[in-house]
Swiss-Prot record:
GO terms, biological process: protein folding
Keyword Chloroplast in record: no
Organism ancestry: Bacteria, Pseudomonadati, Pseudomonadota, Gammaproteobacteria, Pseudomonadales
Name of the featured protein: Disulfide bond formation protein B 2
Membrane topology: Multi-pass membrane protein
Disulfide bonds: C101-C128
Length: 173
């Protein structure tokens, strides 16, 4: 794929990620949605995905660089699927079976190890079990899961194409 074509794809992923981040931010601030810690992690992953793709657009990487960027997109997509999937799972568990509350993420990161804070975050709270907003009968974590699944599939496909093209380039004398 040409450099211009790869920049276009990275630009597209950046724009979609930026739009999703903007929508999530506006829903929380303008819509008055309370954020649980898992939703904060999902937003952080969205921002990281956007940042990686913006760097790829600015750099205009070669063949190896494109493979690295698609690999990073794949990793972020996988982390997003795990996080959003856990959030969707928590929404299907009665809130009485979950922790009542947790301190905010910044407090947990100051007082606990990174691993302990992540573990507590993934345990979830009753806040994470609440469905406060839906669009087309899908909650925000379900939309997030759909977005990350699409990113995972797209990034996996692009990485596979990149690696397959690299193998062909090496095989040719």
């Amino acid at each position: 794929m040409s450099l211009a074509g790869s920049r276009l794809l990275f630009s597209l992923v950046f724009l979609v990620g930026a739009l999703a981040s903007w929508a999530a931010f506006n829903l929380q601030t303008g819509g008055g949605l309370e954020s649980c810690s898992l939703w904060s992690v999902q937003r952080l992953l969205l921002l990281a995905l956007g940042g990686v793709n913006l760097l790829a657009v600015i750099q205009g990487p070669g063949r190896v660089g494109r493979a690295v960027y698609w690999g990073l997109n794949l990793l972020l997509g996988l982390l997003g699927v795990v996080t959003a999937g856990r959030h969707v799972l928590l929404q299907n568990i009665p809130s009485e079976q979950l922790l009542a509350c947790l301190p905010d993420m910044s407090f947990m990161l100051r007082q606990l190890s990174w691993w302990q804070a992540l573990k507590l975050t993934f345990m979830g709270t009753s806040d994470c079990a609440e469905v406060t907003w839906t669009l087309l009968d899908m909650s925000l974590p379900e939309w997030s899961l759909l977005f990350f699944v699409i990113m995972l599939i797209f990034s996996g496909y692009r990485l596979w194409r990149q690696l397959r093209g690299a193998r062909k380039a090496v095989a040719l004398p």
